[in-house]
């Protein structure tokens, strides 16, 4: 009988990536198949996020429901991972003693051994250590699930923003070696992946080791990834302004595979509040980055994160944020009311902004962002957009669906052979959450690079000199 695994994931794209790796790992080692139903699982894993308010209570609420399943099936294994697990550690078992495994983001690769231990002597396991980049050496080969894929290139963060728990839950920055990343991307490309999203808490801080022992830069990595046959669209998430260097901007100038869309969080438009947040950059420095980006790539769209109601934020500070939003003309962005995370410096600050004022500021900010998003979308009406076709539309089985470079969902009439490929679509209608269009060009008509195998390159470049010796001309 097939053993079943259920994974519940909360939080960022890094958590989504980690959960997919857990599923692949436990399938390879124990034969577990994923199930959407917790009731039929042999192992339940909760991959948690500690960014939002009341994250811990959300975890224990779900665990309370899983406790009932364990009463019915005493052999059921329950594991809690992610950032809340890293933060709380043994306290999770103190409050929920029926939890068998507590593991952190850096120890998920040890799950097979943890499960074996619990199965063997029924003793619980708690491991929330930080064994650097070891987890990537222990994970199975990637498995593609559609034409887009996430690839983690680094873990942790050294920036220690005063409101953020990431350095405490995921550790400090550790970069994967360049060859490891390129090999994973090449494996995904061989399985039909056309778009990769490079992940890291501070992705542009990547400083991985090259094959010769030298240290590479993020700009160099972007060019290498974009050069892999089959990969025709490259994204990255999330970056920090302090390390958004000119060499990265140059990649936008000369690498068309890099999308014309960037998520670059600024958090606030007031230098005074940015200083309280520990952001180490000014508004002027942020605006200078955007100006250079738009010189290199005039059509680029920018998204951001915003925190409103940070301790000490005045009406003037908030108005400066609103001014910056208008000046940059941000596209889709993410905004939140400040909530103190335990153990961070901001948790010790006086939270002096009234709750109603926070809600009002959030409403005003989101309304402005939504207006700008609508305006950006309307500008696309009548234009031709390159779409990566993901599959059948949710709205109609008679239509296909894909995404633009700026993440707009576009539905259109097409043929099944277009799935997993690029098509150029004329935008005919802009709706609230999607767009509608018609095909004007298929991938065969685009002149994209033709993938070549090493054997075909050797055959094409093979020559014989006057003495009959075989030489190869690159």
Swiss-Prot record:
Keyword flag tRNA processing: yes
Residues reported to bind [4Fe-4S] cluster 1: 12, 49, 83
Gene Ontology cellular component terms for the protein in this record: cytosol
SMART domains tied to this protein: Elp3 (SM00729)
Cystine connections: none
This protein's UniProt keywords: 4Fe-4S, Cytoplasm, Iron, Iron-sulfur, Metal-binding, S-adenosyl-L-methionine, Transferase, tRNA processing
Family: Belongs to the methylthiotransferase family. MiaB subfamily.
Binding partners and assembly: Monomer.
Name recorded for this polypeptide: tRNA-2-methylthio-N(6)-dimethylallyladenosine synthase
Span of domain Radical SAM core: 143-378
Main EC class the enzyme belongs to: transferase
Function of the molecule: Catalyzes the methylthiolation of N6-(dimethylallyl)adenosine (i(6)A), leading to the formation of 2-methylthio-N6-(dimethylallyl)adenosine (ms(2)i(6)A) at position 37 in tRNAs that read codons beginning with uridine.
SUPFAM superfamilies: Radical SAM enzymes
Domain named TRAM: residues: 378-441
Known cofactor(s): [4Fe-4S] cluster
GO MF terms held by the record: 4 iron, 4 sulfur cluster binding; metal ion binding; N6-isopentenyladenosine methylthiotransferase activity
Residues that, per the record, bind [4Fe-4S] cluster 2: 157, 161, 164
HAMAP family recorded: tRNA_metthiotr_MiaB
Pfam short name (any one): Radical_SAM
Catalytic activity: N(6)-dimethylallyladenosine(37) in tRNA + (sulfur carrier)-SH + AH2 + 2 S-adenosyl-L-methionine = 2-methylsulfanyl-N(6)-dimethylallyladenosine(37) in tRNA + (sulfur carrier)-H + 5'-deoxyadenosine + L-methionine + A + S-adenosyl-L-homocysteine + 2 H(+)
InterPro entries for the chain: Elp3/MiaA/NifB-like_rSAM (IPR006638), Methylthiotransferase (IPR005839), Methylthiotransferase_CS (IPR020612), Methylthiotransferase_N (IPR013848), Methylthiotransferase_N_sf (IPR038135), MiaB_methiolase (IPR006463), rSAM (IPR007197), rSAM_horseshoe (IPR023404)
Main location as per UniProt: cytoplasm
Enzyme Commission number, as recorded: 2.8.4.3
Note on how the cofactor is bound: Binds 2 [4Fe-4S] clusters. One cluster is coordinated with 3 cysteines and an exchangeable S-adenosyl-L-methionine.
Localization (cell): Cytoplasm
